[in-house]
Amino acid sequence: MNVTLFVTCLVDLFHVNVGKATVELLERLGCTIHFPEAQTCCGQPAYNSGYVKEAKEAMKHMIRTFEHAEYIVTPSGSCATMFKEYPHIFKGDGEWEARAKRVADKTYELTQFIVDVLQVEDVGARLEGKATYHTSCHMTRLLGVKDAPLTLLQHVKGLEVVPLPNAHNCCGFGGTFSVKMGPISEQMVDEKIQCIEQVEADYLIGADCGCLMNIGGRIERKGKPIRVMHIAEVLNHR
């Protein structure tokens, strides 16, 4: 099965190991990975900040880059959601609406692809300890991926997965929200960390690097002994 990897900006710039884990995991599951070097940002930051014209240029570039893929897989619910939004953004724009739909229809978040397309629930991972899972806003509310990550984590040998109180509350990242509304964002992430501490988790696992950077940065600043991991790293752990 041919998979074209949409690596995302945050993985490319700050979390290279997440990209490596994604590739190794999918290859172990029998996929052939393709990586278009021309890929850039999906346009989400510009679009959400109101720079629609500039964002559309980035989106058109990504459509041209990915439209011939068999499957498009990304280790980010947020960026997968943006690809899924392309047809709506280009609605009424003849050629580009159709091309955007072709890209959107074959785009999957990593865990969604493993469970729904590959039909795999146990990837053979092993990790000792207690973990809790942070459900990112875009992935659950917009993309609608809720069960796949937990299904995969429940099959990780040695890992006890405990529910996170107020799991669906935002961590305070929200892209540019954390910059524009710093004090509010800080309170939100502090509440998230309190919930993580409440369940005495060794690991905080998530599927979006933006959330993990926000939560992980605050955990580090507070000196808490909690390891933050992307779900791709967990599923690739042996």
UniProtKB/Swiss-Prot annotation:
Disulphide-bonded residues: none
Main function: Is involved in L-lactate degradation and allows cells to grow with lactate as the sole carbon source.
Pfam family, one: CCG
Protein name (Swiss-Prot/TrEMBL): Lactate utilization protein A
Record's GO cellular component terms: cytosol
GO annotation (BP), single: lactate metabolic process
Molecular function terms from GO: oxidoreductase activity
Family per record: Belongs to the LutA/YkgE family.
InterPro entries: Cys_rich_dom, LutA
Origin superkingdom: Bacteria
